[in-house]
């Protein structure tokens, strides 16, 4: 491509080869200037170039700036370095340097392309790095959101669990208080008074454990519930737990029975945690079973070196499609709407039993009650 003596418009790309032709505008110089322009314009060029004619008379300060000693003079401004051709045989000098200038332009464009490619590569790497950082930040955001949700769920869950021992302990203390106001002939036997005191103390200990769990949960999901498993007399634990919740059944005139064999083997577990599971299952059975209904607690030794515990009731039952979902942390069934509580204690039960390498599940039919089962490993 060849350029005229006119300057390129601002919208056009700057030509890689830029030339200035300085002339003195003496009489007769017009023909020489035109001849030089015509000669340069017809030279073969693989690149666009611009040729500007600069009259020295109009801009004399350029003589000093470009250090000109004679005219006409041709200065290569771009590509750098700057080069000046002047004096006699100017056109021959132009013919000599023209191919070299073409090579300079080619090398410069190649270098620019390589630089551009390198810059694009750097930009791609930077973009990739920023994408990685964005991905990590999103992961961190999701992790923090999950921690907050976990904390809210577990605190709500454990706060709900506090209701059970608080209510049971309160009933025991109310009974003791009422007993003090009765006439001596109507007061409870000393054995019942001792049982009520033991019951209140046991519920207080349970609340202390739950408060510890609340403080632990406040630190986030990285601090899981602690299991201190050891040899455990499950039969005795069941009997103690039954005594803790018996008053709840009596208040609703429910028929509560047990079937726990004397030769039930010892299990491997955390007594406080298994007590939580038993209390939760028995409390749910009490809540969902109508007045005068039946609740049964049983345990037996399975052939798979597991002990299975079952809590059955004559409550409304659970639809088959909901029986797995009830162990979720936020699930609440239609039957739960009128019952106080969050309905999320079963999630804690499942977590505890799984940490004992056991299983927990439910068998139920709507209108026919529910049977909650869990297993624990036999101690060996």
Swiss-Prot record:
Q: Which reaction does it catalyse?
A: ATP + protein L-histidine = ADP + protein N-phospho-L-histidine
Report the domain remarks: The N-terminus (residues 1-108) interacts with KaiC, while the C-terminus (109-380) autophosphorylates and is probably responsible for self-association. The N-terminal domain stimulates the C-terminus to autophosphorylate; KaiC does not stimulate autophosphorylation of the C-terminal domain.
Span list, region KaiB-like domain, interacts with KaiC = 20-101
Report the residues modified as Phosphohistidine.
160
Key words of the record = ATP-binding, Biological rhythms, Kinase, Nucleotide-binding, Phosphoprotein, Transferase, Two-component regulatory system
Q: Which organism is it from?
A: Thermosynechococcus vestitus (strain NIES-2133 / IAM M-273 / BP-1)
Q: What is this protein called?
A: Adaptive-response sensory kinase SasA
Q: Which gene encodes it?
A: sasA
Pinpoint the Histidine kinase domain residues: 157-380
Q: What is its EC number?
A: 2.7.13.3
């Amino acid at each position: 491509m060849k350029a005229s003596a006119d300057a390129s418009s601002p919208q056009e790309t700057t030509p890689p080869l830029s030339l200035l032709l300085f002339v003195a505008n003496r009489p007769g110089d017009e023909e020489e200037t035109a001849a030089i322009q015509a000669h340069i314009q017809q030279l073969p060029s693989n690149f666009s170039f611009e040729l500007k004619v600069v009259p020295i008379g109009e801009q004399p300060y350029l003589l000093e700036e470009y250090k000109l000693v004679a005219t006409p003079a041709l200065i290569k401004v771009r590509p750098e370095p700057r080069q000046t051709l002047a004096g006699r045989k100017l056109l021959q000098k132009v013919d000599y340097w023209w191919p070299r200038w073409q090579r300079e332009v080619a090398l410069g464009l190649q270098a620019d392309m390589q630089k551009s490619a390198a810059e694009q590569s750097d930009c791609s790497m930077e973009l990739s790095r920023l994408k990685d950082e964005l991905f990590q930040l999103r992961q961190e955001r999701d992790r923090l959101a999950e921690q907050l949700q976990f904390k809210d769920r577990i605190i709500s869950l454990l706060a709900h669990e506090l209701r059970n021992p608080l209510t049971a302990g309160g009933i025991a203390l109310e009974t003791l208080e009422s007993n003090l106001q009765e006439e001596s002939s109507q007061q409870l036997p000393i054995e019942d008074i001792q049982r009520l005191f033991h019951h209140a103390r046991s519920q207080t200990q349970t609340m202390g454990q739950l408060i510890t769990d609340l403080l632990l949960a406040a630190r986030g999901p990285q601090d899981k519930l602690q299991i201190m498993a050891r040899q455990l007399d499950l039969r005795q634990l069941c009997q103690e737990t039954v005594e803790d919740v018996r008053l709840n059944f009596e208040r609703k005139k429910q028929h509560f029975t047990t079937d726990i064999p004397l030769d039930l083997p010892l299990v491997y577990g955390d007594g406080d945690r298994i007590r939580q599971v038993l209390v939760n299952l028995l409390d749910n059975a009490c809540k969902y079973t109508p007045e005068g209904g039946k609740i049964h607690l049983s345990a037996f030794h399975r052939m798979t070196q597991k002990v299975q515990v079952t809590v059955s009731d004559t409550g409304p039952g659970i639809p088959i499609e909901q029986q797995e979902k009830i162990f979720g942390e936020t699930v609440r069934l239609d039957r739960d709407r009128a019952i106080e509580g969050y309905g999320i204690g079963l999630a804690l039960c499942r977590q505890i039993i799984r940490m004992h390498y056991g299983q927990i599940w439910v068998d139920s039919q709507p209108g026919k009650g529910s049977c909650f089962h869990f297993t624990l490993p036999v101690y060996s």
